[in-house]
Amino acid sequence: TKKMSEILKAEDIDKALNTFKEAGSFDHHKFFNLVGLKGKPDDTLKEVFGILDQDKSGYIEEEELKFVLKGFAAGGRELTANETKALLKAGDQDGDDKIGVDEFTNLVKAA
């Protein structure tokens, strides 16, 4: 499995994480842009999804979403409950309370 820093620039990851280091400040639109995901090909987005899908279930569940920033770098903070729910709501198009790979790529593209 690749590391996030092999897919995206380390300085972009750091900048994005620093921008949202305050609890409650997370905005997935801005984050995906800052971190350099916007405009990346589907294959790259799928690799990123694979890193964030910690249990390799094919979905990012709410519990994993909480750690989404840590997926980009170990120093990332945990999302608050409200931030996690907002991200889930934004990404979950079919209402199954988790984000599949296609939902994830759509979420990034909509950012």
Curated annotation (Swiss-Prot):
The lineage of its organism: Eukaryota, Metazoa, Chordata, Craniata, Vertebrata. Isoelectric points of C1 and C2 are 5.4 and 5.0, respectively. The keyword Calcium applies. GO terms for cellular component: cytoplasm. Ca(2+) 2 binds at residues 92, 94, 96, 98, 103. The keyword Lyase does not apply. Residues 40-75, 79-111 form the EF-hand domain. Acetylation of Thr-1 converts C1 to C2. Belongs to the parvalbumin family. InterPro entries: EF-hand-dom_pair, EF_Hand_1_Ca_BS, EF_hand_dom, Parvalbumin. It comes from Latimeria chalumnae. Coiled coil: none annotated. One of its GO terms (molecular function) is calcium ion binding. Keywords: Acetylation, Calcium, Metal-binding, Muscle protein, Repeat. The modification N-acetylthreonine is found at residue 1. In muscle, parvalbumin is thought to be involved in relaxation after contraction. It binds two calcium ions. Ca(2+) 1 binds at residues 53, 55, 57, 59, 61, 64. PANTHER family: PARVALBUMIN ALPHA. This is Parvalbumin alpha.
